Amino acid sequence: MTYELSTDREFDLIAIGRACIDLNAVEYNRPMEETMTFSKYVGGSPANIVIGSSKLGLKAGFIGKIADDQHGRFIESYMRGVGVDTSNLVVDQEGHKTGLAFTEIKSPEECSILMYRQDVADLYLSPEEVNEAYIRRSKLLLVSGTALSKSPSREAVLKAIRLAKRNDVKVVFELDYRPYSWETPEETAVYYSLVAEQSDIVIGTREEFDVLENRTEKGDNDETIRYLFKHSPELIVIKHGVEGSFAYTKAGEAYRGYAYKTKVLKTFGAGDSYASAFLYALISGKGIETALKYGSASASIVVSKHSSSDAMPSVEEIEALIEKDETITIA
């Protein structure tokens, strides 16, 4: 089954949310306290997704706010360099800084992130800075969960969703749950459920859907889709790590995609690369089952490399991994 989208739009995908800096440890297999060297990359889930999408050949744009500093200029320059439209990337004029994420790679199984997110520019995007004429030029609007964690970014995202719905732009909600961004799980559940119920496509891990539903124990996919299909969503993708991912349609179809074998260097970046390749396949008319394969293959490639944004693969790399058909089979 394919997913129907408008064909008369200039952009395939526009994302709204955070763009920040990732500083990834160059020295592997050691704790942060002993790490001396880091490499700088563009980070932030929605930024990574549009970068990955653009590298795959989609026409992608970005709505967000960056700091008026060296890091902000690096973000804008890098995004432009890979083909992302930055005409709606606003430069902060109130002294807010770029968010920083330092990553620690103790082992493939033990990676952590140290975040600096106090008064960051991306959370100060205001509703007045969201342009309806820009949104209506796209097939999809991608919303990231972290952008809902604080005002005025929260209201800017809610406005963008309203404008998308008014202009027949499909809304994709990438849950992107970061607990350090929120006051309480209950607050997260309120805003996640509000946005999920208005979205057309919802993508996240099983654990992120549990947060959306305010569960304290692992939830059930069938219960999740019963709840969400009472509202706007037409397609729900639930990721289960090495067990693969599952896609469900409101029409009743269900699909499973398996994870691909790879040599894991680190665990972060998988979700963003998954989303960019999954959406690429959907937009290209390849069908939902094939889109699951593209998402899984892209994630497997990125976790084997040092960065997230810079490691986003090409179509040829993804298709080569799919062709090898070396999947992880877990019942």
Swiss-Prot record:
Gene3D superfamilies: 3.40.1190.20, putative 5-dehydro-2- deoxygluconokinase. Keywords: ATP-binding, Kinase, Nucleotide-binding, Transferase. Its EC number is 2.7.1.92. Pathway: Polyol metabolism; myo-inositol degradation into acetyl-CoA; acetyl-CoA from myo-inositol: step 5/7. Transmembrane segments: none annotated. GO terms for molecular function: 5-dehydro-2-deoxygluconokinase activity; ATP binding. It holds the Pfam family PfkB. It catalyses: 5-dehydro-2-deoxy-D-gluconate + ATP = 6-phospho-5-dehydro-2-deoxy-D-gluconate + ADP + H(+). It comes from the Bacteria. One of its GO terms (biological process) is inositol catabolic process. Belongs to the carbohydrate kinase PfkB family. Catalyzes the phosphorylation of 5-dehydro-2-deoxy-D-gluconate (2-deoxy-5-keto-D-gluconate or DKG) to 6-phospho-5-dehydro-2-deoxy-D-gluconate (DKGP). This is 5-dehydro-2-deoxygluconokinase. It comes from Halalkalibacterium halodurans (strain ATCC BAA-125 / DSM 18197 / FERM 7344 / JCM 9153 / C-125).
